Amino acid sequence: MRSDVMIQARNLTIGYRQGRKVKKVHTGLSFALRQGELTCLLGPNGAGKSTLLRTLGGTQAPLTGDIFLEGRSFTTYTEKEISRKIGLVLTDRTMAGGLTVFDLVSLGRHPHTGFFGRLQKRDEEIVYQSLDAVGVAFKAGSYVAELSDGERQKVMIAKALAQECPLLLLDEPTAFLDVVSRIEMMDLLHELAEKKGKTVLLSTHDLEQALLLGDRLWLLSRDKGLVCGATEDLVFSGEINQFFARNEIIFDRKNGNFRPQKREGKKITLKAEGELFFWTQNALTRNGFQLEEQATLVLEACSPHAFRLWENNQIKKTFTSFEQLIAFIKQKELFREREDILPEL
């Protein structure tokens, strides 16, 4: 086993025992999580992501197979030892409404306190630092019952941070957060991995942020099982497209996102640079155009306030905003049967 491997599984079967019945969710899973990496677990609802996280977190026993934590069999750890090694944040709603936010996050320090669980000054500092890291330090004196779903999620992540564990397992940590908070949270978790050497595994439906900040991706589904790899390797191997694409949806490797696949589109050449190229292309493809290098129609984007539409080396129309451009290209009746030719206006 490599020295940088935090947790490893061999031939793992995960699922549930219901009396004498056994419900297998996945079989034959083998993988490793390394120190200093942020791994994003992606998959459709019902794929078994939460089951896998609970199994790795020690709250649900595997049906068969072996898990090793820092090279040692998981079964040899005591609960207290696991609580010092693994910080687990699940989507289960916490029943701690009568506690203050500070009290709840303080529970994360209990693996490090003495028999009576008394917080020392250093423990209190860590609690406040954890609250500040997720942006809810101002809620320290509030009751958990008073929090919004997003605030409660941040508090539970702060509790995991207060544990100061080398391994963090988080089930959809950004599910209830607004757009800005989602980005901030993902950036925080990536920073914990990159700068503090923590091992972070989180499940998410936010593919864009996973592609941007995930060192590795785990793709999980009932029919395909678990596919693991470096983010860019999975992009260029086609695994991302095969895993998520549907009949009319494809993964655009150039832009790193999914988009509707247009069966037929008007041909146009786009001349632009940088971010202006990206957003002009976005407007064109959204409205049924396909970019080609040698189309009859040419759109020249000089700035967000200066566009020129050419046909056969002659300027046919100018626009001073995206709004004008989009309004014009939406007039489908302006185009002849040959969709790459614009009539005289």
Language model regions located:
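Helix-to-loop junction immediately C-terminal to a conserved catalytic motif
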Residues: G57
